[in-house]
Amino acid sequence: MRQIFSHEYRAQWRDMDFNQHMANAAYLDYAANTRMLFLDSVGFTAATFAERGLGPVILEDRLVYRREIRMLETFTVDYQATASTADGRRFKLRNRFTSATQDLCATVDSIGLWFDLVARRPIIPPDDLQEAFARLARSDDYEEWDAPPR
């Protein structure tokens, strides 16, 4: 069964910028952390990736702001798939940041691929990783790519 994975956080002092709201780098950090928490939850820990010599590589992030997140505010980051190639080699993912009152604060759309850390090249992910990723919910605008966008 597909699930939207989510995790709750609290904005910290180190996340703030000069304007007293969460800095853009913090959004990207929380998006990456949520992605890794999902992978960990389906059995792909950091140690698993290291042992198998593979990992995800993000090629592009697109961050869109809707509402500020301020210091000590609680927020949730969810995670879903928005596109992939049929072989699973490349993918597009979306993280949505929502406030405690369910207001959409930001979205991060990320394009990535699976990478062989020894050969230093993109790879088709192993079957068990593809099966784990298949548990992730797909967005309403999900698309399957014949070839990834350039």
Residue ranges and their predicted role:
Residues 34, 42, 136-140:
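Alpha-helix boundary/capping residues
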Residues 20, 79, 120:
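Hydrophobic pocket/interface hotspot
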Residues 3-7, 69-74, 82-150:
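HotDog/MaoC-like acyl-thioester-processing domains
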Residues 1-41, 100, 150:
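Catalytic strand-loop segment that frames the active site of acyl-thioester-processing enzymes
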Residues 38-84, 88-90, 105:
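Hydrophobic beta-strand-centered segment that forms part of the acyl-chain substrate-binding groove
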Residues 9-13, 65, 114:
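Hydrophobic residues in beta-strands and at strand termini
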